[in-house]
Design a protein with these regions (language model features):
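Conserved, mostly hydrophobic/aromatic
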Residues: 29, 61, 100, 113, ...
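Active-site mouth loops of central-metabolism enzymes
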Residues: 127-142, 184-191, 234
Length: 347
């Protein structure tokens, strides 16, 4: 069996985000490529906030698994988790572990000449609806233009990151029912504000209202909002461990669960989270806002769960480009199609 020779993390920049790319090289000369969470969105601080995550990978996890059999993913995951639990069971440590785990799955698929999806049991469907996840645009004209571009690219749904519900109204007036709309406010409101906004979004017929309150992990507040509005709620990108997902789902407030694969421990942990979504009969919609290994891993994961309903596909405004050299996942008639690999299939 090939053994792990090197584990490294590096930072890539694009116009609005960064990617923390993780590479695991083995004794046969093959390289698996993964991705960790990258810190915060603030352009002035995003590189600095990614630095601790990179340090976890380069200084802690990499040395820990160097020399080990590369295909023993489950064993390596639990050993890293058990060792790192004494450091922190969430946050920065788990973000780093996620990136290493994705790289190991990519490496295993490349060794076997097959896709990660096949390693996980194969797809349960021929396609999953994809939506274009737009960045915050704030201006009606830009919002209309980017939605039109996304529709021309084959998307039948878009997600807005706009806190003003009247911007959603502008889009509905422009396109009518020709496009499905989701709205993510990234925990901008207190519960009373969220209820007022949620009622307006309900009138506009949105698919879901995402992360309505701050703190984003205030499960009681999420449940309060959900009980007071008609449109469905989505949340989960800021949960980390299985117990927290269980507590969130137990509120009964969610219609859509949105785990972030680069925060929860990678694909190894993701499989357990999707089982939980199935048990609670809640739709699985993996969160993602980067083009690269994390998006591809989310697609592989989504296709192996019968709970999957939507795939989030990041969308860059006209004239901007992602830093990672990968194409968007294949689509047809608004549906994301299964990926072929080998490995994750993106590099």
């Amino acid at each position: 069996m090939a053994r792990i020779e090197n584990v490294t993390a590096e930072l890539l920049h694009d116009e609005s985000l960064v990617n923390v790319v993780v590479r695991v090289r083995d004794s046969d000369g093959l390289e698996g490529v993964g991705e960790a969470w990258w810190g915060i969105l603030d352009p002035e601080r995003r590189s600095r906030t990614a630095s601790p995550i990179i340090a976890v990978i380069n200084d802690m996890l990499g040395p820990r698994i160097r020399g080990r059999e590369a295909d023993a993913i489950e064993r390596l995951w639990f050993e890293m988790w058990d060792w790192g639990y004494r450091y922190a069971d969430q946050g920065i440590f788990l973000m780093g572990l996620s990136g290493v785990d994705l790289a190991l799955w990519d490496l295993k698929g490349k060794h076997l000449g097959t896709s990660v999806m096949a390693l996980l049991g194969g797809p349960v469907s021929d396609g999953i609806p994809g939506y274009a996840s737009l960045p915050p645009l704030r201006e009606p004209d830009r919002l209309i233009a980017e939605t039109a571009r996304a529709m021309e690219a084959g998307f039948a749904a878009v997600k807005l990151h706009e806190i003003d519900p009247e911007l959603t109204a502008v889009l509905r007036d422009e396109f009518g029912d020709a496009v499905e709309i989701m709205v993510d406010v990234n925990g901008h409101f207190d519960p009373l504000q969220a209820i007022a906004v949620g009622r307006r979004l309900s009138e506009l017929g949105v698919i879901w209202f995402e992360e309505p309150v701050r703190p984003m992990r205030d499960h009681a507040a999420i449940a309060r909002v959900g009980a007071s509005i008609e449109c469905d709620l989505a949340a989960g990108e800021n949960e980390y461990v299985l117990e927290d997902f269980d507590r969130l789902l137990a509120t009964g407030a969610l219609a859509y669960l949105q785990p972030e694969i680069t925060k929860i421990g990678g694909l190894t942990a993701a499989r357990r989270v999707s089982t939980l979504a199935e048990l609670y009969n809640v739709a699985l919609c993996p969160h993602n806002f980067r083009l690269g290994p994390s998006l591809y891993a989310s697609v592989h994961w989504a296709f192996t769960s019968p709970a999957s309903r939507w795939i989030e596909v990041p969308w860059m405004p006209d004239g901007e480009a992602f830093s990672f050299p990968a194409a968007l996942p294949p689509m047809r008639n608004g549906q994301v199609l299964p990926l072929e690999g080998p490995g994750l299939g993106c590099g």
